[in-house]
Amino acid sequence: MARYRSVCLVAALLGAILLGSAGCQNGAEPAHPAQITAAELAERVGTQAAPLILDVRSPREYAAGHVPAAVNVPHTELAGRLGELGIDKSDELVVYCLSGKRAAMAEQLLEKDGYTSVRDLQGQLRAWQGGGYPVE
């Protein structure tokens, strides 16, 4: 009886392991639903479908190069400047910085303030530049 329980336990554990790894067959990590890739954003920049792009880095970093059409609103000023942007809370927004830390803070602030379509640039500005997309 004890052996039967052990066999059942091992079979159950193996089944759980196999089921848990079924979604990871190709090894690719799925994109976070609140992200947009550099390629997706590049296709939309300059079109009617372009989101409002917020560069939340410092003005100095922004001046050194930014995604075309991006508006510079440093993450430390974002809360006080939301009104001047003239955007609806349902408008699509894309936020980015250099590494993702400031963009994550901005995304959290925007969502807390009721903005419903906030995404961040997957890989941030480094991914944009690494993809060979233009900077202004």
Per-range role (PLM):
Residues A2-L52, P59-E92, L98-E136:
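Rhodanese-like catalytic fold shared by cysteine-dependent sulfurtransferases
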